[in-house]
């Protein structure tokens, strides 16, 4: 499993995950990335999302219709910037991931997890076994 020490984070990774920042839309690594695989927490390495639930939302950030395991996601009320939103954080590392909204694809449950690329790392399907995520291969065989 991939893990990263907080001292190894880039400036934007630190700002996003530790200071609740947001990276610019359309100028981040995974907003338009649709390869087969999983997305893990940048710090803990815990699997959070799969490419099977990723969709193109036109918001400029990676969007997913559901989390791989709801127990790995913490939801908190976020009243910053004069808005009321639902913040999502990773359970194990308590890193800020982004927000979840109720405007996702209805056929997939209606949720849109809007996630900062700086908070996650993509693991290609072909590398799942090698990197310790072999138990997730079955999610793609449905």
Curated annotation (Swiss-Prot):
One of its GO terms (cellular component) is cytoplasm. Keywords: Oxidoreductase. It catalyses: L-methionyl-[protein] + [thioredoxin]-disulfide + H2O = L-methionyl-(R)-S-oxide-[protein] + [thioredoxin]-dithiol. InterPro entries: Met_Sox_Rdtase_MsrB, Met_Sox_Rdtase_MsrB_dom, Mss4-like_sf. Residues 2-125 form the MsrB domain. Belongs to the MsrB Met sulfoxide reductase family. GO terms for biological process: protein repair; response to oxidative stress. The gene is msrB. GO terms for molecular function: peptide-methionine (R)-S-oxide reductase activity. Its EC number is 1.8.4.12. The keyword Oxidoreductase applies. The active site is at residue 114. It is an enzyme of class 1 (oxidoreductase). This is Peptide methionine sulfoxide reductase MsrB. It comes from Staphylococcus aureus (strain JH9).
